[in-house]
Amino acid sequence: NYIYYFLVAKYMADNMHCKTGVDNIMNLCENIHDDQKANILIFIAHHIKNPQFVEATQLALMSALDNQKPVSLSKDDDYYKLLNEICESLKQEIIKPTEQIDPEKEREKILKRRDENERLVSNEKVNPNSLPIEIQNMNKSLRSIEVVGQIVKNRQGSLPKPDIKTMVMEMYGAAFRTIGYFGAIIESEREHVVEDVINNKNEGASNNEIIKKIDSFFELTSLNFCLFVFSKVINAVGSKELRSTFSQIAEEIGTPAAKLVSFSIISCFSKIAIPELEDLVEDLRDNPVAMSIIRARVRSYLYNNHVNFSDRQKIINTVNLNPRDSHIVANKPSRKSR
């Protein structure tokens, strides 16, 4: 598949100087919800520096779910209300106090799970145009994020910094609209699901118990989808060279969601600056949803990076993972890193 995508992308990039070539690129952008077309666009991004290509992919990104209100994860946000209860219950997630952690092994586990998931997805042959329109709309947005992210990564040294910043901000916007779109679907379907389950229930469980379990399912699904979309942005555009850009965007957008994405990117691709973490926690301390995501991100950071004992203690205390973590040991260095 990769050889096919590479050759098709090279051919299309070499022929973009003519009208037919431009039309072909535009067709790919209009049908970016199709995985095959999106993959070709990602490969084209390796070959081409044509401004028309950059503009076409940006347009696809900006137009994706453009009528949808983006999530903010502020307390008055509808999506926040979907997540609040389950995030309250996750407050006590901890890192085991005496656990020896090998970051290399932890990263290997993550990569293995990712490969398994990709293999399962690649084995499923589905006509993208036969999927429900809601799925197509979300796929268009998510695939646009991947393509524009590839352009940013490839051309961060040649494109003007304001252009890079604009493109990344559009990626944030598309991600937040996608999450909002999913939340609207969840809200619209919840009552139908509750009604169907109650009407077809077996004796035993009360209606209140059923509603509670369904609500928990929707809350967990909503949280997982939010983190999934955040991870799309992180993987698409993550780069330690753009650290200052991510910080600027978080400040300009100003929402908890933007601050969480920027913090997540920075912690994935460079070292956590403890003063910055302290400022973020101080800003979002009263937001259980944001704090739950910060703790999850910090936990991942500590499991996947070598962090000395002193910094580890400061980070744990800053996010208040658990009082018992005052005795946590530093990461165990692997033989390879000695």
Task: Give a label for each model feature.
Residues Y2-F6, K10-G204, V229, V233:
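Hydrophobic repeat-domain scaffold segments
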Residues T166-A174, G180-R338:
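Charge-dense, extended regions
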